[in-house]
Each structure stands twice: as C-alpha cells, then as structure tokens.
C-alpha cells in the first residue's frame, strides 16, 4: 500500500500547471516554480496521500463504500481498471448531474440496465432486427453512463476524485450530501471543501495511475482486515490450538 517519494517523482506528481493559472489557495503546497511551471512540494503531498490512504483503508475495514471518479481522457481506463481490481463502484465516462443528489432516479436506471441485460442473456429472438438494434444501443448507452455503478445500491460513504476542478459538479453534490471527499488537487484549483487533499499533478497518466493504484491498494487492504476481524470474531475459544492442528495437517 505504501507509496514512496521516488515513485511520486518518477510519476511527475510534482509538476503543477503554468504559474499564471495558479490558485493562491494552493500556496501552502507549492515548493516554487521552474520554467513558469509551479512545482508542488512532495514533502507535503506524500504524507497527505498516506493520510488519504489510511482513511480509505479504515473506511473499507468498517464496510464502507468508496466511489472512484475520473472521467478525463488520460484517467478513464486507469481508474476503471483499479476500481474493478478493488471491487468498488466507479465513474469513468461522464458525471451525470444528480448522480448523487438524485440517486433515487439513478437507481431506476440501474434497475433498467440490469433488467435489459437479463433479457439480452435470455435471447432477443422475439424482436425484429430494428428492435434488437434499438435495444442494444440503449444497453450500450446505459453501460457507458452507469455501468461502473450498477452494483452501488446506496450512496457511497466517500468519493475519490482525480481533478476536483474538472469534476466540480460531483464535488458540489458530495458536499451538499456531506459525503467525505478524497481529491487530487493541482496547482490551478482550490483545495477548499476537500476532506483529504492530495496536492499533485492531475494530468499525467503516470501520476493518475499512482493515485488510483494507491487508493485501490488501501481499499483492498481494508477489506482484508474486515474479513480477518470476522474470522477472529467467529473463531471458538482455543482457536490457536485449532489453527496449529490445521497447519500441521497441511
């Protein structure tokens, strides 16, 4: 789960935006500038990223759900792959307005998608070719819009966002509902309202991969801890001796 300073350097996490586009509220996290590009202070970014990982791990250990969001071109595939690896919901194409604040309607769309997929698996022979084409196109659209959240039965307990400025609608919805935010904040955006700020480059594919992998690792580790706690709670007295017998039998 641990991320090192060297990994951050190699991923280009320290490269911010052009100095003329900076947000003064990011001043505490900026080391300086080079060739009119702000340099983000990794001595601050690293512990803040680790704090975000710790939060993600603890939340998941307590059976909380984290929604991962990254719809920028360079983030889509990377984020979707890591979310799938961690077994959590994700949004990788576009954020639909009301995805959180109007979740009741979104759940209706999710049910529609699941029903249509079940119908597709059963066979569409009773439909005309034109009807099949229309049906398939609707499924494809629903998959693109909400496929990553089709197993999310309730609002998430936290949201991880790559580029809070690009996803300002998602940020606003989360804040309105009081859902904690883990956010990658570049030098041109404001960290205000983000519960766990990760100051860093939000454009580099390598940096995006690092953030997504780090949070996914924390989620997986947290879930493993939750499973271990359940096993320990269910184990009868004298279970240590029982485990030793199992090991010797193996």
Swiss-Prot record:
PANTHER family: 30S RIBOSOMAL PROTEIN S2 PROKARYOTIC AND ORGANELLAR, SMALL RIBOSOMAL SUBUNIT PROTEIN US2M. GO terms for biological process: translation. One of its GO terms (cellular component) is cytosolic small ribosomal subunit. It comes from Paracidovorax citrulli (strain AAC00-1) (Acidovorax citrulli). GO terms for molecular function: structural constituent of ribosome. InterPro entries: Ribosomal_uS2, Ribosomal_uS2_bac/mit/plastid, Ribosomal_uS2_CS, Ribosomal_uS2_flav_dom_sf. Belongs to the universal ribosomal protein uS2 family. Keywords: Ribonucleoprotein, Ribosomal protein. It comes from the Bacteria. This is Small ribosomal subunit protein uS2.
């Amino acid at each position: 789960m641990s991320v090192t300073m060297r990994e951050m350097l190699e991923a280009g996490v320290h490269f911010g935006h052009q100095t003329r586009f900076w947000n003064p509220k990011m001043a505490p996290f900026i080391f300086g500038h080079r060739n009119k590009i702000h340099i983000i202070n990794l001595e601050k970014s690293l512990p803040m990223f680790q704090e975000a990982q710790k939060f993600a791990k603890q939340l998941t250990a307590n059976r909380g759900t984290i929604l991962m969001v990254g719809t920028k071109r360079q983030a889509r595939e990377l984020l979707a792959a890591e979310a799938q690896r961690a077994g959590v919901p994700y949004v990788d194409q576009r954020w639909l307005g009301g995805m959180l604040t109007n979740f009741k309607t979104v759940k209706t769309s999710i049910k529609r998608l699941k029903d249509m997929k079940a119908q597709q698996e059963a066979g569409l022979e009773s439909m005309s070719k034109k009807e099949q084409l229309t049906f398939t196109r609707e499924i494809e659209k629903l998959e693109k819009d909400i496929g990553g959240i089709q197993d999310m039965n309730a609002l998430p307990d936290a949201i991880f966002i790559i580029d809070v400025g690009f996803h300002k609608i998602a940020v606003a919805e989360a804040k309105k509902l009081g859902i904690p935010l883990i956010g990658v904040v570049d030098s041109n955006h404001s960290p205000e309202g983000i519960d766990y700020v990760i100051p860093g480059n939000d454009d580099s594919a390598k940096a995006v991969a690092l953030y997504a992998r780090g949070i996914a690792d924390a989620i997986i580790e947290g879930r493993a801890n939750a499973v271990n706690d359940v096993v320990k709670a269910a184990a009868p007295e004298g279970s240590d001796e029982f485990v030793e017998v199992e090991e010797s039998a193996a």
